[in-house]
Amino acid sequence: YKSVTRDVKRCIDSLKALSVDGIIIDLRNNGGGSLQEAIDLTGLFIETGPVVQIKSSSGRIEVEKDFDRSIHYNGPLLVLNNSFTASSSEIFSGALKDYNRGLIVGESTFGKGTVQNLIVLKGSSQIPICSLVS
């Protein structure tokens, strides 16, 4: 989905208006989605910085970062994972853990270690390209 970050931002705004004490994000059984959405979503909770490294088949490593210095929510955060939390959901959860931004609870994630990027062709055709992430 290409609107996850926008939708989560709206939810956060609603929760802030209610003066909640914290937010729980449930990623259980979430198979992932757009890598860019995972990066942008992470950016709602961190100031700026690297979110994920992508290693191409040629061995080149590319670091994907959040460049937006604003933090949309800096309160208490809890993320629920299970063995079906995969792909970009793992990236989001892992980034929050790496930044000590929230408490990550539940089971170990799927451990997919890859994401798919779609190359859009003329018309409505798309080709999924897998990349290794770390």
Model-inferred region functions:
Residues 125-134:
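C-terminal "exit" segments of structured domains
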Residues 1-125:
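Cleft-lining beta-strand/loop regions that shape enzyme active-site pockets
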